[in-house]
């Protein structure tokens, strides 16, 4: 869990001393966009046109942020257009690595790097910042397009439609205001909320984050009691963004991040929602619980020094979801 400073790798944990024990996530640095015609997107530079086999995703199967991009890639049928490399789930003094001695870890098929930070240095030899996944890489310009998952899923949603992507709009114009509103508080209190709880180094910071987290889960349980998905009957990116956190909640966050007021399995609607999306064609293939559990329990030595992996609660993913 380190970072690059002026192109040099430093093995450093998050600094919470200056924030009252509160975890503060840094913003993504690369914010370019792939667009249908290569014109500039909402942020960043132009020049990234949607083309078959031009782009490559670097992901961790453990990471909820990277998982979003794999979901959208699958839903839009982009598996043959956008290739993927999967890092090793264990992240220690060198950050994410391309070791391939764990099932489904692929190594770096493009450059045969040992570490993900080397890819960042390929894009910017003087880069300063965290080295995170996902990374959307341009194989033509040999650079990072984006390392912001929220942006990448919107690119995959529409940019490749003219290239033969599967039909489906997960950010439709008529729902965008509602989706943006949901994304805002779900990100702050749930997606990032589990990390703010788990990485807190003061009681006050933990209490604040975990209280907000379970308040939001109760709110989501109520919303999902009214309709199948967060905005109604249409699956949107808001559902996908929430879902990747819910996948990891009972197996990891309850124990490892001390988010233990309730389990997702204790919520009728949230657990049904979790199963509903999991049982959609191809979605189960994006879920890798061995990577998830190994990453969290074995990588975060400040939280779990022994590296012992919790057994975790049982959950039947294939039980009828009772929704729709």
Labelled PLM ranges:
Residues 1-324:
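C-terminal alpha-helical interaction module
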């Amino acid at each position: 869990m380190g970072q690059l400073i002026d192109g040099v790798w430093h093995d450093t944990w998050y600094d919470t001393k200056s924030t009252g024990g509160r975890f503060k996530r840094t913003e993504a640095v690369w914010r370019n966009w792939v667009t249908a015609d290569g014109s500039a997107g909402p942020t960043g530079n132009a020049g990234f046109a949607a083309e078959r086999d031009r782009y490559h995703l670097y992901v961790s199967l453990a990471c909820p942020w990277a998982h979003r991009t794999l979901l959208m890639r699958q839903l839009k049928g982009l598996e043959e257009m956008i290739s993927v490399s999967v890092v090793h789930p264990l992240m220690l003094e060198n950050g994410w690595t391309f070791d391939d001695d764990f099932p489904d870890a692929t190594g770096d098929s493009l450059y045969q790097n040992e570490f993900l930070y080397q890819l960042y240095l390929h894009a910017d030899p003087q880069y300063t910042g965290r080295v995170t996944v996902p990374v959307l890489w341009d194989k033509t310009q040999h650079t990072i397009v984006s390392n912001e998952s929220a942006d990448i899923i919107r690119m995959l949603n529409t940019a490749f439609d003219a290239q033969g992507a599967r039909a489906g709009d997960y950010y439709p114009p008529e729902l965008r205001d509602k989706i943006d509103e949901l994304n805002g508080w779900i990100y702050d209190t749930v997606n990032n909320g589990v990390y703010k709880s788990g990485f807190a180094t003061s009681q006050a910071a933990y209490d604040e984050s975990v209280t907000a987290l379970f308040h939001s889960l109760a709110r989501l349980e109520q919303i999902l009691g009214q309709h199948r998905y967060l905005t109604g009957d249409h699956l949107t990116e808001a559902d996908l963004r929430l879902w990747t956190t819910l996948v990891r909640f009972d197996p990891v966050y309850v124990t490892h991040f001390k988010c233990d007021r309730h389990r997702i399995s204790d919520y009728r609607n949230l657990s049904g929602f979790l199963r509903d999306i999991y049982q959609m064609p191809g979605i189960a293939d994006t879920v890798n619980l061995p990577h998830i559990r190994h990453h969290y329990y074995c990588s975060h030595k400040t939280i779990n020094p022994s590296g012992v992996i919790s057994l975790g609660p049982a959950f039947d993913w294939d039980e009828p979801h009772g929704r729709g």
